Regions:
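Signature of dsDNA virion morphogenesis modules
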Residues: 1-170
């Protein structure tokens, strides 16, 4: 597992607050057929996430795919109870730890909306390079994405992947 503290396996994100910082953590994508009929494989997520994390200045977190950077994916975070949360891809999916900015008004607005419960989901943005139409009894008809480039993680009301949601850890 990527973290030392328990996390629900229903895709929920836990909010961790330290000082004036706002840090959230949870699954931004899990391997399942999403609302658009796409299934991103864990292998694709693992490769794309590895490349994404190599350039620390470009680990973009946006609001609703708006091109406004409101935070950054960070490698890990230790909460006030001493639990370590780590970004990476595990058996459930792509788990991210995100530190929100507090130096711009839009990021402060996002933090406020998270605390109010208005923003509850994650989505990811990128470019798919390898897609294949598939069909099986458990998933029906879907498009499997086995290679992609990850450009950003976005915070939104509801993501396309229903398991990419969060709750506040109090």
């Amino acid at each position: 597992m990527l973290r030392t503290s328990p996390v629900t396996h229903n895709g929920s994100i836990n909010l961790i607050k330290a000082d004036n910082d706002l840090v959230i953590a949870g699954y931004a994508s899990v391997e399942m057929v999403d609302k658009q009929g796409d299934l991103i494989t864990r292998g694709a997520l693992k490769n794309a996430f590895g490349d994404f994390m190599k350039a620390d200045g470009y680990r973009n977190v946006q609001l609703a795919h708006s091109n406004i950077q409101v935070g950054s994916v960070i490698p890990s975070y230790t909460d006030s109870d001493g639990r370590v949360w780590k970004s990476g891809v595990d058996d459930a999916g792509m788990f991210v730890v995100i530190k929100l900015r507090d130096d711009i008004e839009k990021a402060r607005e996002v933090a406020k909306e998270i605390r109010k419960g208005a923003l509850r989901g994650f989505s990811i943005g990128g470019q798919a390079f390898k897609r294949m139409r598939k069909s099986d009894a458990s998933h029906g008809d879907y498009t499997e994405i086995s290679k992609l480039e990850l450009h950003e993680v976005t915070i939104c009301e509801k993501g396309i992947n229903p398991e990419a949601t969060f709750r506040i850890l109090k």
